[in-house]
Amino acid sequence: MAMKNLLSLARRSQRRLFLTQATRSSSSFSAIDSVPASASPTALSPPPPHLMPYDHAAEIIKNKIKKLENPDKRFLKYASPHPILASHNHILSAPETRVTTLPNGLRVATESNLSAKTATVGVWIDAGSRFESDETNGTAHFLEHMIFKGTDRRTVRALEEEIEDIGGHLNAYTSREQTTYYAKVLDSNVNQALDVLADILQNSKFEEQRINRERDVILREMQEVEGQTDEVVLDHLHATAFQYTPLGRTILGPAQNVKSITREDLQNYIKTHYTASRMVIAAAGAVKHEEVVEQVKKLFTKLSSDPTTTSQLVANEPASFTGSEVRMIDDDLPLAQFAVAFEGASWTDPDSVALMVMQTMLGSWNKNVGGGKHVGSDLTQRVAINEIAESIMAFNTNYKDTGLFGVYAVAKADCLDDLSYAIMYEVTKLAYRVSDADVTRARNQLKSSLLLHMDGTSPIAEDIGRQLLTYGRRIPTAELFARIDAVDASTVKRVANKYIYDKDIAISAIGPIQDLPDYNKFRRRTYWNRY
């Protein structure tokens, strides 16, 4: 009986095996039948081999490199790291920035938020210390002071009282490439603020006694700036990095120029640089675009029409980066301060966004703020744990045709060697050891920082004015975030290899810096032996 059962099981197994083979054979026949008649059995190619994981990774890398080497030309003008489009829905849902260009070339740009109770209106001018000569260096800053010293319609006192009576705030600042005059007022005083701005920019009197009085004020300001070592370090950094070029000049200018600037110099600077085509009227908050445009048409009627553009001026005197250093030993200072920088990207360079992410990856840290030792940045974590600095800050400065990317640090004299090694180690590491987690963290921190910075009408107006002067348009937040999200670890490595790895550096240092390594040691640490 047991033998019969075994034989029965054997027959069933053979029957199942036969049915399985028959099914497989019929599938093979079906596949052959589906081949076109013109193809002979011998023409059948063997099945392709399975794609190995490293082959798949190599294909992804090739596609990314292809995108990086052949970016969409539409984005080259606007600093996109590689072609990627933002969602149109997000862009359209953001507050609209409306721009109107008047016949004389003056641009009026607004972002309306009628629920706000305040507004900021200002004039952003494509003029700064970069567009001066050695003889006139300091004129732009001197003019910023003199512009509030009375017009044909308003005395100095009347101007100050008018702004105070409406609860407003009037201010100005000068940088290397831009000058700005702006007013923050209540929603009912926007037209009055525009009238004040138009008056001071077109009808300032520049009385000789006022000029002489302001000359002394600026000389005292220069003494105050010389006492701010961080300002001195960064001014010296520009002077050595861009030596013998316009970007190397200071904003305040040398003392001998301040002592010799005349009324004619101020008037000539306005005529040649405060031109309609180089100016943007920006407004944000409780403003209506049509009303602002009409007011600007009515008020800004005396602007110069000099055809010279900043692009022509930059082309005539381009910035040139020079690997070099400047050191000032001062043992009276309690701490040493220094900055080390590489040549960075311009505003419109496709790599500028990646450098912003890299700046965030390096981060900043201050011993007195209490940020903690276990922060996300490898550099700040190394500095904090080993206690080799009082503060440290990565910076990324953009200009029309170049930039500066580097680190500024404050430390005790006996920590300089360890600190300089840590800085160069972590900065150079960006060229070949970057994790996706670090890049993602930096992207999120950067986006958060940008959003927090845009809180208020004044930062929004400043953003509008600056972007129209640098990009020619206002970049929507959603589009900017899409560009930031397009930066990954491979992008960071590529950009770091382009701007950092084995590249010249500029160094500026002040204080008890005898133990700061020499230039050649810094330079050798811009590369590693990776073999």
From Swiss-Prot:
Q: Which residues form the organelle targeting sequence per the record?
A: 1-78
Q: What is its EC number?
A: 3.4.24.64
**Compartment(s) of residence:** Mitochondrion; Mitochondrion inner membrane
Q: Activity regulation here?
A: Binding to the alpha subunit is required for catalytic activity.
Task: Show the GO MF annotations.
Answer: metalloendopeptidase activity; oxidoreductase activity; zinc ion binding
Query: Topologically, how does it sit relative to the membrane?
Result: Peripheral membrane protein
Q: Which reaction does it catalyse?
A: Release of N-terminal transit peptides from precursor proteins imported into the mitochondrion, typically with Arg in position P2
Which keywords describe this protein according to UniProt?
A: Hydrolase, Membrane, Metal-binding, Metalloprotease, Mitochondrion, Mitochondrion inner membrane, Oxidoreductase, Protease, Transit peptide, Zinc
Q: Which residues bind Zn(2+)?
A: H141, H145, E221
Q: Which portions of the sequence form the region Disordered?
A: 30-50
One GO CC term, this protein = nucleolus
Q: How does it assemble?
A: Heterodimer of an alpha subunit and a beta subunit subunits, forming the mitochondrial processing protease (MPP) in which the alpha subunit is involved in substrate recognition and binding and the beta subunit is the catalytic subunit. Component of the ubiquinol-cytochrome c oxidoreductase (cytochrome b-c1 complex, complex III, CIII), a multisubunit enzyme composed of 10 subunits.
What family does this belong to? Belongs to the peptidase M16 family.
Free-text function comment from the UniProt entry: Catalytic subunit of the essential mitochondrial processing protease (MPP), which cleaves the mitochondrial sequence off newly imported precursors proteins. Preferentially, cleaves after an arginine at position P2.
Record-given protein name: Probable mitochondrial-processing peptidase subunit beta, mitochondrial
Q: What is the lineage of its organism?
A: Eukaryota, Viridiplantae, Streptophyta, Embryophyta, Tracheophyta
